[in-house]
Amino acid sequence: KPDCPLICTMQYDPVCGSDGITYGNACMLLGASCRSDTPIELVHKGRC
């Protein structure tokens, strides 16, 4: 597994991931995708 050294702000700007989960912002989605076995893509801005 690669390191996932993302440091995200806590600014709330929700995005919906391809896993059906709402992330607090795009950076948080990228961090989750990095740690996941399957890539998570941004489906749309806003809550899922």
Curated annotation (Swiss-Prot):
Site annotation Reactive bond: residues: M10, Q11
Sorted UniProt keywords: Disulfide bond, Protease inhibitor, Serine protease inhibitor
GO cellular component: extracellular region
One GO MF term attached to the UniProt entry: serine-type endopeptidase inhibitor activity
GO biological process, one term: cell differentiation
UniProt cross-references to PROSITE patterns, sorted A to Z: KAZAL_2
Disulphides: C4-C34, C8-C27, C16-C48
Location of the Kazal-like domain: 1-48
Described purpose of this protein according to its UniProt entry: Exhibits strong inhibition toward Streptomyces griseus protease B (SGPB) (AC P00777).
Protein name: PI-actitoxin-Avd5a
Organism: Anemonia sulcata (Mediterranean snakelocks sea anemone)
